[in-house]
Amino acid sequence: MTSPFVGSWSYRSFHNNPDLAVPFDALRFGAGTLALTEPAFGQVSGTLGGPGWSLALAGHYTYGNPNHARFQGSGDIDSEHWVYDYVGYLVPAWPDGVNQTPAIVGSVIRTLPHSNGQAAAGFVASFIAVRQR
C-alpha cells in the first residue's frame, strides 16, 4: 500500500497573525511544490522548492486518525544552509464532500537561523499543501 502522502502538492505557508485587519497577502511566508516519495514503508522523502531554492526532505509518516507525517527539509540556498522541520496531517475526507481535493495541514519551524540573523531559529508558521491533479 502506497502512503497517502506520496505525490506532488502545492505548498503555501502563512504567518500566524490573528489580526484580521492584516491583508491576506501580508500573511504569506512561503510557497512552492512539495514532492513526496516513499523510499520504504513508513518513510517519506522528496523535495520542497520553487524558483531559485529547494530543500531535500526526509522523515516518516504514520497511519492514524488523521494520518500524519513529520519530516525535515535542508538545503543550501544563496550560500547559506537552511533547515526547517514540518509536521502535517492529512485532512480526512468528508463523507458527503463534493470533489474534495486531498490536503495536508500543519506547521513548520525554522530549525536553524539564516540570512545573517534576519531569519531567526524557532519561527513557526502554518501551512497547507493541496494535491496537484
Show where each model-derived region lies.
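Short beta-strand segments that buttress and anchor functional surface loops
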Residues: 11-13, 44-50, 70-78, 106-109
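Mid-chain, well-packed structural core segment of small domains
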Residues: 61-94
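N-terminal glycine/threonine-rich, aromatic-flanked beta-hairpin/loop signature
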Residues: 21-60
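Short, surface-exposed coil-to-beta transition loops
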Residues: 28-31, 53-58, 80-87, 121-124
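Short, cysteine-centered beta-strand-loop-beta hairpins and adjacent loop/turn segments enriched
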Residues: 16-22, 51-53, 78-80, 113-118
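Edge beta-strand at a domain terminus
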Residues: 60-61, 103-133
